[in-house]
Amino acid sequence: MWIADGWNDYEVIDCSEGEKLERWGDYLLVRPDPQVIWNTPKTHRGWKKMNGHYHRSSKGGGEWEFFDLPEQWSIHYKELTFNLKPFSFKHTGLFPEQAANWDWFGDRIRNAGRPIKVLNLFAYTGGATLAAAAAGASVTHVDASKGMVAWAKENSRSSGLENAPIRWIVDDCVKFVEREIRRGNHYDGIIMDPPSYGRGPKGEIWKIETSIYPFVQLCTKLLSDNPLFFLINSYTTGLAPSVLTYMLSTEVASTHGGTVKSDELGLLVTRTGLVLPCGSSGRWESGK
């Protein structure tokens, strides 16, 4: 398991009865987590003194309840700054477990010894974009949500990366990749964080179990002659790490060599010292 253990401003304090107690900077949040099927005692004071609590509804969705929580605040990871604000379906605008991947591809970029172009697809609020840019890459950031791209730009300014070579694109990721292929553009690194389910601007349906493999095949056409890495993230329990390994092995390593590794991502739980699973990642990297 790849554990994001480099945080100072974030921690999972405890988890029990379908919820996790987290510290985001100076504030405590309680949010639902489907992986938390145990009912260990909730002894930490934060369970009763949280600043925000997302209550899931039996009808689907849910709502936030706030206790002295600002509308927006920020936390830091190494040289990066992220602006947080609770919004729909329990989210805050950041997935802290992804820091394990930021460190991995950041090291690859810094040690490449050449200019690196990175494509970040389904790029959300830009955690991976900023990590790649801070490591020295030129990044193309693509997300279908105008609001998410605006949030990512805000994070870039807060991180002092407003002048970094980042291209911000609001577009359907599949359509964008198809156009980039026609344009003849290529990238040394590709990152994708696809949703389990989604709809495109013209009603196109994205279902990860049936859409991800042809999309990976499509994206390989954008790899440069000397690619550096390819990263796939999945929060869908049906896509085991071994599935990600198989895809990257057949579609990337078969052509470019290198190595493929896939594993769960995790966050340490302070109270127990155990690890909370947070999805999976598949990594291909060149042997160069």
Predicted regions and their residues:
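Conserved SAM-binding loop of SAM-dependent methyltransferases across substrates and taxa
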Residues: T125-A137
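Conserved SAM-binding motif I beta-strand of class I
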Residues: S138-D143
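S-adenosyl-L-methionine
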Residues: S145-I191
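Mobile active-site "lid"/loop adjacent to the S-adenosyl-L-methionine
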Residues: K146-M148, V170-V174, Y187-L218
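C-terminal catalytic and target-recognition region of SAM-dependent MTase-like enzymes
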Residues: P227-K288
